[in-house]
């Protein structure tokens, strides 16, 4: 009988007899014996995790709700980049609450991700159309980091320029994040007034400028002349724009913007006490190859049909490493999909209507307040009014509060009110009366814009078919379902991606994210209104600190890569404070994730590679040599544990000692934390800082490429250098727009830890290890396991080596991954960390039946490869090279292949019961990059051309 709640037995796949069979196959009697032979004894935890006992699903939900009920939910019109929204129920129910959408992985395998890819193309089209710039990416983390990425983009476009101007009317949190990013990159940030700044005074050293549109105080400005003067110096112009405002006011592309960034939260996404939200970026065609993040493009499949794919991937961190455009990996795909569905559902006319209604309600409030004698400073506005109330700002905020509303205190003399689509005429009347101190007439009867005609948008947007076809709920529901059916997610099959930890995202964990108590708070509400969510975040931080063995944890980073960057910044700021700011060398093993060198470069560090030996372990002699050679300038080492080769390296504590002895800090990449929890921890090993991927180890879903949270845990000496924020009273080191990053979805991990308890968490780690070793044992005689520990065992993942087979058969590792789609699986991680190999991570959640199904598929694929090698199957026209096979392919009237239709589509009998069909055939990546298409209008033209 389990000593913990029954949730752990529902989360963990193999139970009872299945475990015994798996252990027997490995030659072990108990799980404890297996773990003892895998995890080095000198790093094992001496005591169980000091966490509360597991609760049932019902108990955990009740406890969390009781905590979150301590929040006070008022109507909030603070603005500053965050607004009340209405998520259409059809989108909430069929997308946000649907595991078919939230459990998928990043769409690196386009043949089984066409649904998400289509919606991301819709997202890009929406952004491009609204901003008036031809190219947009498929989301970034938040507006602050998007602005920081734009600064880097400008600098890369003009590498000899070291100065960047930021208008002082940008959102304060954005300015903080930019300052953090610039601190160790040698960029001089000037914050000032656009009207008095002379670009010519900086000249060739000016990389670019950033303005807010409308600005943080609500003013709509015409930047045409300013941008002309900036362009005269050769610098670039960046606009942080509100997409909802762009439905009715002039698009940035019309007045000379080179880059546009912002947040799509206004498009139906709850505020979430700061997140998650999908940021966006668009740019001119000339800058597209410098753009960070994922870019969706169009190509063709083997039948010549149009197919979506990730384009221009050579810009990304997993390929270019420290030379990448950014360290961005996980972004905000699910939120981008939600925002795009919002635009699809409302269409151009619906969006324009919402934008117009917001503005006219704001104008009605303007009219009521001015009639009551309250001065409004901005005459050209969209949704925000700047109240001039000398010495009375605090009193105004208090009056609004007493009436049930939050408004923004700008300074002692000014307050601001930002309305949104949730504002009603009753709200306007109540707010006006409260601020005026008497009953005030505030009829919603305005019918003309309050801005000068020059600011009115003249161009149409979102005219493409996708935005003009699905405006009834029936049509929308079916469109969502059609797209979902094109993607393989965890509700369909195991996703055995190594280093990705695609474990169960349980329904109970997901329930709280739609509670108003969790998702409707503005991140800048008074502290007494957010007691509940801050208590939840504090509990989560404390539990993560105990799990990692660290003194403190910051939840601010919005993704794992952001956590890496934040951790490195903590080290650099600590060293600078200690008078060792010259330390700028980062040692990184050659097996490391691509984000490691990319993050190091962002933190202003020089990357020095460390070799690995023939067994895949870090070459300790080379490490010692490099550490000693760079001891005067050594900042840190970045090390993943267990290693990216799937092995618990026996020398990890020695590694930490060597680095520390030479003046460096140890940064541990927490990507493989799923093999540590409850058995060991970064603090036990000797690390100084570690980031966690809550969307891996702690059960947060991947969302098809985000959202994620990448908190960092640090040792005592680094605690003062955790990320700050304006709302925390110290802004230095801010890496996100909100103090707690994507706060609302932290509830998922709170639930996971509460329901698993210390015993369940340890057992999950042990079972992840057992599952990986079971697969390695069953497949190792066909596909050699490339690296293993001293006793031939692996950690929580294993690298299968098909290189001799693929060489002899004239195949590639891609052929195996694509063929797995015919068997109903997402392929494992390909060619990382070793080219031509497959890295498999089954996680603890997969039952033995699913593991056996995967093993059977790989055994059959081995037989198919062998048939090619011995001449039984054709070397060119075979099931592997032609995979994946679509329903259209196998049902065609003509069949000219030397293998049968059933061999193509139903290679094992289990597929006769249930079959997942790839929506398109193999996608031509080269064609897609040579014929880059990134918006729907050009997709429609492209499709017609392909048909011709």
UniProtKB/Swiss-Prot annotation:
It catalyses: N(6)-[(R)-lipoyl]-L-lysyl-[glycine-cleavage complex H protein] + glycine + H(+) = N(6)-[(R)-S(8)-aminomethyldihydrolipoyl]-L-lysyl-[glycine-cleavage complex H protein] + CO2. The modification N6-(pyridoxal phosphate)lysine is found at residue 696. GO terms for biological process: glycine decarboxylation via glycine cleavage system. It is an enzyme of class 1 (oxidoreductase). Gene3D superfamilies: Aspartate Aminotransferase, domain 1, Type I PLP-dependent aspartate aminotransferase-like (Major domain). The glycine cleavage system catalyzes the degradation of glycine. The P protein binds the alpha-amino group of glycine through its pyridoxal phosphate cofactor; CO(2) is released and the remaining methylamine moiety is then transferred to the lipoamide cofactor of the H protein. Belongs to the GcvP family. This is Glycine dehydrogenase (decarboxylating). It comes from Akkermansia muciniphila (strain ATCC BAA-835 / DSM 22959 / JCM 33894 / BCRC 81048 / CCUG 64013 / CIP 107961 / Muc). The gene is gcvP.
């Amino acid at each position: 009988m389990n000593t913990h709640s029954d949730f752990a037995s529902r989360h963990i796949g193999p139970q009872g007899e299945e475990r015994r069979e798996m252990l027997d196959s490995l030659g072990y009697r108990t799980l404890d014996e297996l773990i003892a032979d895998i995890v080095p004894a000198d790093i094992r935890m001496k005591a169980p995790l000091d966490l509360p006992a597991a609760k049932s699903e019902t108990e955990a939900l009740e406890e969390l709700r009781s905590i979150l009920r301590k929040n006070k939910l008022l109507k909030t019109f603070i603005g500053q980049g965050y607004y009340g929204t209405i998520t259409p129920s059809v989108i909430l129910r069929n997308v946000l609450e649907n595991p078919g959408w939230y459990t998928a992985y990043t769409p690196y395998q386009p043949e089984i991700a066409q649904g998400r890819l289509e919606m991301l193309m819709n997202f890009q089209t929406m952004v491009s159309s609204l901003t008036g710039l031809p190219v947009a990416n498929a989301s970034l983390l938040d507006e602050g980091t998007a602005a920081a990425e734009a600064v880097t983009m400008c600098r890369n476009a003009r590498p000899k320029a070291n100065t960047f101007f930021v208008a002082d009317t940008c959102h304060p949190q954005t300015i903080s994040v930019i300052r953090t990013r610039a601190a160790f990159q040698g960029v001089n940030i000037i914050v000032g007034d656009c009207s008095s700044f002379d670009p010519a005074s900086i000249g060739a050293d000016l990389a670019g400028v950033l303005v807010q549109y409308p600005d943080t105080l609500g003013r709509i400005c015409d930047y045409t002349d300013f941008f002309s003067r900036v362009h005269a110096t050769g610098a670039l112009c960046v606009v942080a724009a509100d997409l909802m405002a762009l439905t009715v006011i002039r698009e940035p592309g019309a007045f000379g913007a080179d880059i546009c960034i912002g947040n799509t939260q206004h498009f139906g996404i709850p505020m979430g006490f700061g997140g998650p939200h999908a940021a966006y970026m668009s740019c001119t065609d000339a800058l597209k190859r410098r753009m960070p993040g994922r870019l969706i493009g169009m190509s063709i499949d083997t039948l010549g049909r149009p197919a979506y794919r990730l384009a221009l991937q050579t810009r990304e961190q997993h390929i270019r490493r420290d030379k990448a455009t950014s360290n961005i990996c996980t972004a905000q795909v699910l939120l981008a999909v939600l925002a795009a569905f919002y635009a699809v559902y409302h269409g151009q006319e619906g969006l324009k209507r919402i934008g117009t209604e917001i503005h006219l309600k704001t104008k009605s409030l303007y009219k009521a307040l001015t009639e009551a004698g309250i001065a409004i400073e901005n005459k050209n506005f969209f949704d925000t009014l700047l109240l001039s109330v000398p010495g009375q700002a605090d009193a105004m905020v208090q009056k609004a509060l007493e009436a049930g509303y939050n408004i923004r205190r700008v300074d002692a003399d000014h307050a601001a009110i930002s309305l949104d689509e949730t504002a009603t005429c009753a709200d306007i009347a109540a707010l006006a009366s409260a601020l005026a101190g008497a009953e005030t007439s505030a009829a919603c009867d305005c019918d003309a814009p309050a801005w000068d005609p020059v600011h009115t948008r003249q161009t149409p947007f979102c005219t493409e078919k996708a935005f003009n076809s699905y405006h009834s709920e029936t049509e929308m529901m079916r469109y969502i379902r059609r797209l979902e059916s094109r993607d393989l997610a965890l509700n369909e099959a195991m996703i055995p991606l190594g280093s990705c930890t695609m474990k169960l995202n349980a329904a109970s964990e997901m329930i709280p994210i739609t509670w108003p108590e969790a998702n409707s708070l503005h991140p800048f509400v008074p502290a007494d209104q957010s007691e509940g969510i801050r208590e939840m975040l504090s509990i989560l931080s404390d539990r993560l600190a105990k799990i990692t063995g660290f003194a403190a944890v910051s939840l601010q980073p919005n993704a794992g890569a952001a956590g890496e960057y934040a951790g490195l910044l903590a080290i650099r700021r600590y060293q600078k404070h200690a008078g060792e700011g010259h330390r700028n060398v980062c040692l990184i093993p050659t097996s490391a994730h691509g984000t490691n060198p990319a993050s190091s470069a962002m933190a202003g560090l020089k990357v020095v590679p460390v070799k690995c030996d023939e067994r895949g372990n870090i070459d300790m002699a080379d490490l010692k040599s490099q550490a000693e050679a760079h001891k005067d300038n050594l900042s840190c080492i970045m090390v993943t544990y267990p290693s990216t080769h799937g092995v618990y390296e026996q020398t990890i504590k020695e590694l930490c000692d060597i680095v520390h002895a030479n003046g460096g800090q140890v940064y541990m990449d927490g990507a493989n934390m799923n093999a540590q929890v409850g058995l060991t921890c970064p603090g036990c090993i000797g690390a100084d800082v570690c980031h966690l991927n809550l969307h891996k180890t702690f059960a947060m879903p991947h969302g098809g490429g985000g959202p994620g949270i990448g908190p960092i845990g640090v040792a005592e000496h680094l605690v003062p250098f955790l990320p700050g924020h304006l709302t925390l009273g110290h802004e230095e080191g801010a890496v996100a727009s909100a103090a707690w990053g994507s706060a609302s979805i932290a509830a998922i991990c709170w639930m996971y830890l509460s329901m698993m308890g210390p015993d369940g968490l340890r057992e999950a780690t042990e079972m992840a290890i057992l599952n990986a070793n079971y697969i390695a044992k069953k497949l190792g005689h066909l596909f050699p396991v490339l690296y293993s520990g001293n006793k031939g065992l692996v950690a929580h993942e294993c690298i299968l080596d098909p290189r001799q087979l693929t060489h002899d058969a004239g195949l590639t590792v891609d052929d195996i991954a694509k063929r797995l789609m015919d068997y109903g699986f997402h392929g494992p991680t390909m060619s990382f960390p070793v080219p031509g190999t497959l890295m498999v991570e089954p996680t603890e959640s997969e039952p033995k039946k699913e593991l056996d199904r995967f093993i059977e598929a790989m055994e059959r694929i081995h037989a198919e490869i062998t048939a090619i090698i011995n001449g039984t199957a054709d070397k060119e026209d075979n099931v592997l090279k032609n995979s994946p096979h679509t329903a259209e392919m196998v049902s065609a009237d003509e069949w000219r292949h030397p293998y049968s239709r059933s061999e193509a589509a139903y290679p094992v009998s289990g597929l006769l019961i249930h079959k997942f069909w790839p929506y398109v055939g193999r996608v031509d990546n080269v064609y897609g990059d040579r014929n880059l298409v990134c918006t729907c209008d050009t997709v429609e033209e492209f499709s017609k051309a392909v048909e011709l």
